[in-house]
Amino acid sequence: VLALDVNSDPYHLALALVSPDGNLRRHLTLSLEEVDRAPNRGAKELLLWKIAHQVVSLAEEHGVAVATERLKHLPKGRRGDGSGRAFRRKQHRFAYASLLRKVHSLARKKGVQVVEVNPQDTSTIGMLKYAPQLSLSKDVAAAYVIGRRALGFKEKLPKGYQKLLGDGAFLVQAWDFYRARAEELRTQKRNERDRSRRNRLSRELKKAQGALSLLSSPLGSPGSQDGFTEGRKRPGANAWRVLRVGTFLPLLGREVPRDLSPLKV
């Protein structure tokens, strides 16, 4: 299959060609910066159709299906008005949704099969497992997971991660980090008078509280293609998410680290 994912910074489409045995055969990116700079909606639509043709032509060249996240998980139109990184990210998602619909439409017209999967945790799994293991960017790694999921593969935790989750000291260290972070954010929020900054602190506090809740829950299954695509849920915290909150910010210093090589095991 040829699997797709999008990245906001730099703004491009990541493609991963995945063989039937689940291995990564090839990967590449298509820049979407020109779409971002398009002077009007008509010009943007033409560029998106051009990229859709490139994607479908690549799938035809290799004789494979196209794998994407399910369209129902994507925004259906433009909303809001504003600027800044968060707004640009939202606009990029709207453009990505439009691009995927074009890819789906064009692929079906040309007789190329389209496989849709639930994208839940594909980015997290990609960043934790394949980005460090195969030296991939996080978006290519996410596309790879989408492709493997479309082929029916289940993502198992590497032994190093299994050992880490079984290490009580790791979980305690992560818990202490987020507890201290939550206390610091509460203090900053109490002393902050600017409304926009208070709102930002509230969002950060909510994330820290969510991490504490996740770290205090018993671990469930690390997840599988079946569980995600068919909607079945297993009890307990998702092990991939526990690893993400336990490693990214406490150990690597960022919620979405650019360099994931320290996680290579």
Residue ranges of each PLM-predicted region?
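Positively charged, helix-rich recognition surfaces that bind polyanionic ligands
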Residues: V1-V265
